[in-house]
Amino acid sequence: MLDNFNVIQNLMQINKDCFYVISIIQRAKDFENEFSERKHKEHFIRHFFVKDAKELLDIKQNIIDICKMYNARAYFGLDAKNIKKVIAEQIKVETDLLVNSEQAIQIYRKNFQSIPRKAECGESKLRYVHVDADFKNTELLNALRTELNPFKLTEIKSPNGVHFVGRNRREDGNIDVQKLGNTLADFRTKNNNKDNELELKKNSMIVLYK
């Protein structure tokens, strides 16, 4: 079991015009051969939308129950979304549905689920360092922690490794993304790590519960 509720709630910021997205998804890697014949290796279950840490904890048990029922994972969108921008994007999608009725289903599938991703709040964005399975090597992981320590990143467990999360603005003690990227590149080169084993990501979902 992987439970990141307590860590993630401390990363949330309160803004009356914004909300966070939680997606519950089945992953093929959690089902051995059951997904082998499917074209898509992920299956969407449902979304939750919360405005603050209290709302997140209020639905915690519901999220856990659904994950257990479907052997699914709950993912949390690190960057908050703007309510007005979401409504504006939804109007655009619905207009496309009316104008292109013959392609309505394709338009819906392609665009509707992606609406929140286009409607960021515009505040300081969160970035995270994705560390994959090979870093279960304790000595290597501790070496990486030492390299990342100056950036004061929050450490969050993942199914195959760990994530280090921080804000991307330089002011007020937030991280310098360019410097962080250079640090990761140097570490990869020195330790012969592949790019996908150690990545700097943005606007991504992070595992809330599994």
PLM region spans:
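Signature for HUH/AEP ssDNA processing cores
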Residues: 1-159, 169, 178, 204-210
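Short amphipathic alpha-helices in soluble, non-transmembrane regions
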Residues: 143-148, 174-191
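A generic structural motif
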Residues: 152-161, 193-199
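C-terminal polymerase-core module
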Residues: 186-210
